[in-house]
Amino acid sequence: MNHGVYQNLFIDSLDSVDPQIAEVLDLELRRQRDFLEMIASENFVPRAILQAQGSVLTNKYAEGYPQNRYYGGCECVDLAEDLAISRVRDLFGSEFANVQPHSGSTANAAALMALTEVGSTIMGLELDHGGHLTHGMPLSFSGKHYKAVTYRLDPKTCLIDMDSVRDLALRHRPSVIIAGWSAYVRHLDFEAFRSIADEVGARLWVDMAHFAGLVAAGLYPSPIPWADVVTSTTHKTLAGPRGGFILAKKEFGKAINTAVFPGQQGGPLMHVIAAKAVAFKVAASEGFRERQRITIEAARTVAKRIGEDYRLRDRGIDILTGGTDVHMVLVDMRKSDMDGLTGQNLLHEVGVTVNRNSMPYDKRPPRITSGIRIGTPALVTRGLSLDEFDEVADIISNALLTIDLPKQKQRALRIARTHPVYEGLRQY
């Protein structure tokens, strides 16, 4: 049998085997270089993470856990997973860690499976008030398999009112209380959540997917002393590969391991786990902590500049809660003729990437929304200064006011090209 044709496909580079996909990679690299990435859930991973994720570990199947696999030949990938586990435990001071979840949503599903029974009552922040799909949204597994009740933000302050959370918990007696968010710009009171959970006999699960990097840097309260289980993604503020992990008190370790495998997944992605290990090592560095500090300061700079722009206020556009304590800014358009989708598209037109986002008590549908979410992590990773973030905020304001869009695009491109990303990177 002549294997020559396949052998060529096996050893040839991507541009030879599949030029169409090679072109997609080139186009995306160009987009990332020339746009100002301000989606709060995105970041740029270090080149070392790209290398780990694109490694020969892709080839290895490893169902089970280190030193207890269902396949042979796992002695090398065991080393990678053991490193990832020990590093993330040390990083956050946790008794237990599982680094196998393919995503944050998978980690969340496993957390619920480990903590409670199908059909039981769970309680989390409502989606359009800043929660996440997996915290009880009706179309999600969390809303289909569990009886979900949701707490809302105070209509005046747009903050979580812990007295209201307590009243809701006493009324519904959930088995799991969820503290966490995808769009909330202030700190959570984990001690108060713990007190409420204890009062009603609930488990406390914290989803720190968005703020894990801030916790690692000591710039956001740690949920570890208070929560029974903590879930997170490894991207966003952690700037690692796309994936998830679970931290917990030791007593929940066995249930979580079973919930992840075989409960939610089969074989883990060992190349991604190796990349997670790299991310956890980087996150323990002083340079990472400094970057997180700048990330928050940059978000505050953007919030202040946009919030103080009288031209936007005259159009009914403001900053939700008047500022931020985290890596994101929520631009509130509920009183404006402009909607979130229009704002997102205008910013994309000038080379700034954001996402539209529902606001508390939003009257517009989710595909339109009354706000946009702006994040600073990716641009801080690129090296922008606070003065440059001030200019970026001015670009955003002018774009939302439709003032000389070609000029705003030129300004954004100049800033982007001042801070090149992945210089000299060979993708194939």
Swiss-Prot record:
(6S)-5,6,7,8-tetrahydrofolate binds at L127, G131, H132, L133. The modification N6-(pyridoxal phosphate)lysine is found at K236. PROSITE patterns: SHMT (PS00096). Pathway: One-carbon metabolism; tetrahydrofolate interconversion; Amino-acid biosynthesis; glycine biosynthesis; glycine from L-serine: step 1/1. The record marks H235 as: Plays an important role in substrate specificity. It is found in: Cytoplasm. Its EC number is 2.1.2.1. Homodimer. GO terms for biological process: glycine biosynthetic process from serine; tetrahydrofolate interconversion. CDD domains: SHMT. This is Serine hydroxymethyltransferase. It holds the Pfam family SHMT. GO terms for molecular function: glycine hydroxymethyltransferase activity; pyridoxal phosphate binding. It comes from Tropheryma whipplei (strain Twist).
